[in-house]
Amino acid sequence: MAANYSSTGSRKEHVKVTSDPQPGFLERLSETSGGMFVGLVTFLLSFYLIFTNEGRALKTANLLAEGLSLVVSPDSIHSVAPENEGRLVHIIGALRTSKLLSDPNYGVHLPAVKLRRHVEMYQWVETEESNEYTEDGQVKKETKYSYNTEWRSEIVSSKNFDREIGHKNPSAMAVESFTATAPFVQIGRFFLSAGLIDKIDNFKPLSLAKLEDPHVDIIRRGDFFYHSENPKYPEVGDVRVSFSYAGLSSDDPDLGPAHVVTVIARQRGDQLIPYSTKSGDTLLLLHHGDFSAEEVFRREQKSNSMKTWGLRAAGWMAMFMGLNLMTRILYTLVDWFPVFRDLVNIGLKAFAFCVATSLTLLTVAAGWLFYRPLWAALLGCLALVPIIIARTRVPTKKLE
């Protein structure tokens, strides 16, 4: 099926060298001015990211605390208790579905919440390595383009290659990837809402060892179905298909017992739906495994804390990069003097580090003002430390 496309030989590569006149002072100054605008936008966005992150973190913490104080655990999942109607309930049990999920084209059938068909095509892939250097007053860029064949799940457009001749890929796959989802999923007598079903994403690879070749033109090798004349030596355009599943919904002699999950949700009849809190937020949790209600909320609080620190770090980094770009023009003004240029570069980075750290702490404190005023005041004092240190070092250097 790959006869119309490039044959797969050994790894191919070629080198291209381009040259441009070395930019003058005014040209470099103009480029730096553009970087200042990008830096300003990045700098301002960092404030928004840090401030809103604090609001989100505290809001989530309060939401989880409220949920833990309200949650109840029914005596049995095999009966619907009327006294829990509208309440936040803690449910543990094995998943069940009403019918098998299948892909008849490949003879795959199994009890699961989700069945995913993953398709890859053998294609040419271009990689490039660049090296810039100055020679005879010109800036030269040497780029090495390499071409190799790989299995890829996305179409690689050979039209964007530096050299398409001899490395042409098909424009579409003969088979498409898809995910089938069971329409109804239960735990005991309770039906899971669409939001809970979406959270069942613990995909595991499906072994094809006991399946036969579904068609004459499809060959099974290991855990793949190959649309290829020779899977051992594939050609560009050949396709291979694998399967994975999430949420095993029945005991299976080959795949194991049905998957057990822990759910925190609102009971409405025999439905498990999102719970609306007093603050207007919704609570809908699903964890893979058997956990007590306290353990579920403890895991959620830990996840919230990790996300908060991750976004704080991202905000600080955005602020640091923004300040670097905004002050880059000072480096450009002195880059004709190597020794002085290096000193200025170190000083600008130290300045950006101190200012980014101080402003990040101040922004975090501002985000806490509405929730924890005392902690906000403490953070505000800590935020002044880097600035005080930086200012006290300046007179010392002058005296030296």
UniProtKB/Swiss-Prot annotation:
Compartment annotation: Endoplasmic reticulum membrane; Nucleus inner membrane; Cell membrane
InterPro entries: TMEM43_fam
Membrane topology: Multi-pass membrane protein
Perinuclear space side: 53-313, 367-368
Residue positions where N-acetylalanine is found in the record: A2
Organism domain of life: Eukaryota
GO biological process, one term: nuclear membrane organization
NADP found in the keyword field: no
Keywords tagged on the record: Acetylation, Cell membrane, Endoplasmic reticulum, Immunity, Innate immunity, Membrane, Nucleus, Transmembrane, Transmembrane helix
Nuclear compartment segments: 2-31, 335-345, 390-400
GO MF annotation: an example: identical protein binding
Assembly behavior: Can form oligomers through the transmembrane domains. Interacts with EMD; the interaction retains EMD at the inner nuclear membrane. Interacts with LMNA and LMNB2. Interacts with SUN2. Interacts with RNF26; this interaction is important to modulate innate immune signaling through the cGAS-STING pathway. Interacts with CARD10. Interacts with gap junctions proteins GJB2/Cx26 and GJB4/Cx30.
Functional summary from the UniProt entry: May have an important role in maintaining nuclear envelope structure by organizing protein complexes at the inner nuclear membrane. Required for retaining emerin at the inner nuclear membrane. Plays a role in the modulation of innate immune signaling through the cGAS-STING pathway by interacting with RNF26. In addition, functions as a critical signaling component in mediating NF-kappa-B activation by acting downstream of EGFR and upstream of CARD10. Contributes to passive conductance current in cochlear glia-like supporting cells, mediated by gap junctions and necessary for hearing.
Family: Belongs to the TMEM43 family.
Record protein name field: Transmembrane protein 43
Organism in which the protein naturally occurs: Rattus norvegicus
